[in-house]
């Protein structure tokens, strides 16, 4: 039950920031249509190429240093102002350089590009790394949730036609700025006034160079695919790729909660010095993530292409082809996250835990640059999948002294079989129904879930055993609550 509680907490936090944009997507896709959405996504991706690398490097550096510092407000304050000064100066210089490039290069959609520069203001004001570093993460989580809520009503009021693209971009940027400003309002409770010397600033700049190099490839892989698709294939292709990617991110967020929850088991085993228990936690993480990720991936790959027609519109039909490739990223990423997060919790002497991420991101970037211009938007999806596969393989190699590859296969093959059977069942339904309508998409999803569940129960896996225990405990509590409610209403003494 404790694992279930942690999973729900972790998943809810992530889905808040993933599901709301998904709801926005269906509205924006119908209002701005495929061209408007493509222009927004493409220009945003190009602007974020520089912002994301710098902001991520600063965030990782600051959080890492703050977590090692003693809980002293004066020390934290001196560190904060020194790092933020570096953040502000670098991002202002990048913003000015980007402004000059936009004006001098005679780019298409110049007006839209200039509006996207407002995100530099949001990045300059983003101090979430301070709260994460001093273990006040809930403040950042609330900020992220509030950010999505701030956008909801204004979106419906202000964005009503394809001509409202500029309003949409300003809305996204301004709400980001407002949400980040709210973090500044809490500074008096965590910092005190201090003086900042130039020596502190110079020290931070030198220390950040390593983190800048470490964040380069992973951040490029997040935005370069959409940027290259936008430049070489056009606005419509980048819109359909972004739509597919957003749907897949929701699937990954659902599974990532399992990996986060399983970290508590690794920590407990480490505290009692149980090496065998730590190794078993790796296998358990893979098993539980497989059980959920394979089901979600099968649904995304089969039901997703049908649902796209009514969820986004017929102009987004190409999104279905991309989903059939990106869906498998859900499974591969869930395995990689499960292994890497358990590795971090175990602290078994692996210093270069980012090696797999760096190599996988590098493969993704290289494939994107060379394949997308020639083979189109589907190549971007394959580049993402291959990059994740390379990262997973390298992660397994790094853990070869701790985990057995064949044991990983043994704990996951039954869910793969269940996924294949569910896939065949869903395809049979798709061929039987008259078309891609919401009621038929719901039917396909239900059929897939039922078939998958039956096959998994047939194998009597550990996930089934755990599920039975949780269900029986839940039913017992419901029964006891009903008895107690009846006793109180009827005034029956115990």
Where are the model-predicted features located?
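Membrane-water interface segments that mark the loop-to-transmembrane alpha-helix transition
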Residues: 6-17, 21, 43-44, 48, ...
């Amino acid at each position: 039950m404790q694992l279930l509680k942690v999973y729900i907490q972790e998943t809810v936090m992530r889905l808040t920031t993933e599901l709301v944009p998904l709801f926005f997507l269906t509205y924006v896709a119908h209002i701005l249509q495929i061209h408007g959405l493509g222009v927004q996504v493409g220009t945003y991706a190009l602007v974020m190429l520089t912002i994301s690398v710098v902001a991520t490097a600063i965030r990782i550096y600051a959080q890492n240093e703050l977590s090692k510092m003693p809980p002293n407000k004066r020390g934290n304050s001196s560190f904060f102002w020194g790092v933020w000064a570096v953040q502000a100066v670098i991002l202002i210089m990048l913003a000015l350089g980007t402004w000059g490039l936009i004006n001098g290069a005679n780019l298409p959609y110049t007006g839209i590009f200039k509006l996207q520069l407002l995100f530099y203001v949001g990045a300059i004001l983003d101090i979430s790394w301070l709260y994460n570093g001093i273990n006040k993460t809930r403040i950042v989580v609330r900020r992220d949730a509030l950010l999505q809520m701030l956008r909801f009503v204004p979106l419906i009021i202000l964005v009503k036609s394809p001509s409202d693209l500029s309003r949409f971009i300003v809305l996204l940027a301004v709400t980001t700025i407002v949400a980040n400003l709210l973090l500044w309002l809490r500074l008096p409770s965590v910092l005190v006034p201090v003086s900042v010397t130039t020596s502190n600033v110079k020290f931070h700049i030198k220390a950040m160079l390593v983190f800048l190099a470490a964040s380069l490839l992973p951040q490029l892989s997040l935005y370069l695919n959409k940027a290259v698709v936008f430049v070489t294939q056009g606005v419509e292709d980048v819109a359909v790729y972004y739509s597919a990617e957003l749907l897949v991110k929701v699937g990954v967020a659902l599974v990532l909660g399992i990996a986060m929850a399983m970290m508590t088991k690794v920590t407990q085993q480490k505290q009692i010095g149980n090496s065998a228990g730590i190794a078993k936690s790796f296998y358990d993480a893979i098993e539980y993530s497989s059980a959920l990720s394979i089901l979600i991936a099968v649904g995304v790959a089969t039901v997703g292409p049908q649902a796209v027609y009514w969820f986004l519109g017929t102009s987004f039909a190409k999104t279905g082809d991309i989903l059939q490739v990106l869906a498998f990223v859900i499974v591969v990423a869930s395995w990689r996250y499960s292994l890497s997060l358990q590795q971090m919790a175990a602290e078994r002497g692996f210093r270069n835990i980012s090696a797999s991420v760096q190599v996988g991101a590098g493969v993704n970037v290289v494939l994107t640059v060379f394949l997308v211009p020639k083979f189109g938007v589907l190549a971007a999806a394959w580049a993402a999948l291959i990059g994740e596969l390379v990262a997973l393989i390298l992660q397994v190699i790094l853990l070869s002294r701790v985990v057995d590859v064949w044991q990983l296969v043994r704990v996951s093959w039954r869910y793969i079989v269940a996924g294949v059977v569910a896939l065949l069942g869903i395809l049979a339904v798709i061929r039987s129904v008259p078309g891609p309508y919401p009621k038929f998409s719901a039917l396909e999803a239900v059929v897939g879930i039922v078939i998958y569940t039956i096959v998994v129960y047939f194998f009597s896996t550990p996930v089934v055993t755990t599920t039975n225990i949780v269900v029986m405990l839940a039913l017992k509590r419901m029964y006891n609550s009903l008895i107690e409610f009846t006793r109180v209403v009827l005034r029956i003494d115990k």
